Amino acid sequence: MKKTSLTFNRVIMALAFLFLYAPIFLLIVFSFNAGDSNTVWEGFSTHWYAELFQDRLIMQSVYTTVLVSLLATIIATIGGTFAAVGFYSLRRRTRNVLNTVNNIPMMNADIVTGVAMCLFFVAFFAFWKDLAIWFNSIQSFIELPTRLTMNFGTLLIAHITFNIPYIILSVGPKLRQLDKNLVDAAMDLGCTWMQAFFKVILPEIKPGIVSGALTAFTMSIDDFIISYFTSGSSSSTLAMTIYGMTKKRVTPEINAISTLLFVTVLVLLAVINIREAHMEQQAQRRKLLSTAEIAARGPEKRRKPNPFMKIGAGALAAVMVITLVVSVHGKTTGRVVNVCSWGEYIDESLITEFEKRTGITVNYQTVESNEALYALLKAGAGDYDVIVPSDYMISRLIEEGMLEELDYSNIPNFELIDERFKNLSYDPENKYTVPYTWGTVGIIYNEDMVGGEITSWSAMFDDQYAGEVLLINNSRDALGFALKTLGYSLNTTDPDQIREAFEMLVDATRRGVYQGKVMDEIFGKMEGGNAAIATYYAGDYLSMADNTDEPLAFVVPEEGSNWFVDAMCVLKDAPHKDEAEAWINFMASTEASLANMDYIWYASPNREALDRYPSYYEELYGEPLDPDVYAIMAPPQEVLDRCESYVNLPAEILALYNDLWIQLGVS
């Protein structure tokens, strides 16, 4: 009976570990795939690792991650060790209370810590601005900067803050094992408190310090949520970069970088566990030795550490930190521009080309939706220079005074923008924007899975596709296609019509029509044949069709849809306005527009690029561009005539959208 129970327990344990590590093992295996598929093995290759180390954005995030982790670990280890010693000197009741307080940040949700730190920095920056203005007004010898933004410094402070509790937790037990009489004896023999600390206390607690430091370094390497809220626009950690890369599809390059991150954390944890096991074995051996045996052996001769080894180790560590500082920040000491856009919404070679031509360093970050961008800006966590929101969000930002008027004399390529994309409703006087891309929202469907052609939004509510339909995770688009199905305008301000559309979504959700809400996760779902129907953007459909053998099709439904324009804007009081306008002018050029159209499959508003793209494609690939593909990329006027552009809705209607969307998530 006991043997059967033991076997059963082992099987359960094996299955648990298999379930836990099988996905990671699969990720590691496909990081060596010669092709770009995550399901079909095409041969062994280290190609993706080579690509990884040649990617400027990834390597910059690696440097930032390692640097912030090293600095945060060093500072937190020093501060946490002295804090632990301070706890140790207190009375037991007080010490227990403080230890409980110390444990709270480790048990607290990272999202709470991240948002709290973000709000703290925003409040401090507002206070600093008022203080600097007052201080500068009463004297002229020292001028304090009035504008502070989230940057590498705030990221470092955040990492130090969440690392210190781990140091205290690791050092505390070693201090409690320490015989207090040793410290008293050392001080009776003439040691100062500091000498007693370094000669007596430090050697005893060193194992705890090392374990705490390794844990802190691991936590910093692995952190995403707190970094996301405190890094600002100029610093991006490796975890943030991976998150941005996964917004489209999981490529073998992402597998490669995830593998390296997993191996790094695994090695650090192994070092921690091996060291702790070694220290426990030493402690047990010491306990086995009797006092008589120790006395019989006589005084143990300890090998004095070579001072040159200490100096060399310190110098090596200093060189590593300095090298990383120079690597990460050497380029940003000059002119920079901080850009925020959507995932895979630019040909990254254009970033390199712009930097080469202008000497301006580009810090490029991504966000998943207009609403996420707005929330980030309102929270004060997005100190960008250039953003690329959609039309309706631009209108909202203008109304709230969050955008800066452009100096179009610095943007001569604005003259290349087709007249159809000037003086639109979101910027009727062309003061704030330069159009970046345009396109339509429609239905993407798998022809084999649906067994025919789709022409209407009613397919999004059809029971025959239950469990195979992806609902776009965007309140305007999701409620928008429901409104169109009912024959209403996308921009209706009638609450009853909006609620009627909402009830359609709720009913379909309860009937199991929707597989789930998605944004860029749609790429993996549709390309892998894991869903039949989805609502998404025409340019992304073309990207999917180009990367899969699944028979995907796209349609702008007969009821009409949304046609959108994403435009480049400069945020109010942007610190690098001249650089921002230089970036906008470069991206609006015909050369950049053609390269970008070919990479992201979205049409450019540049009239020369629109006219030249079919011949550009044929010259580049040696075959003509399919007219049907071009009609999806740059839809003809008859398609646009049955579509609407979003406009910014009144505040009470936006609040209604938000409330209904939250209710839909609950339902």
Regions found by a protein language model. Give the residues of each.
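Transmembrane-helix boundary motif in ABC transporter permease subunits
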Residues: 1-6, 71-102, 115-123, 128, ...
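Interhelical loop and adjacent transmembrane-helix boundary motif
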Residues: 3-5, 49-57, 221-278
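C-terminal transmembrane helix and the adjacent membrane-cytosol boundary/short C-terminal tail
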Residues: 3-11, 172-183, 187, 197-199, ...
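Transmembrane alpha-helices
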Residues: 12, 17-24, 108, 161, ...
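Membrane-interfacial helix termini and adjacent extracytoplasmic/periplasmic loops
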Residues: 37, 46, 94, 111-160, ...
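Glycine/proline-centered hinge or cleavage motifs at structural transition points of membrane proteins
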Residues: 189-190, 203, 437, 441
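Early extracytoplasmic/lumenal segment of secretory-pathway proteins
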Residues: 328-397, 524
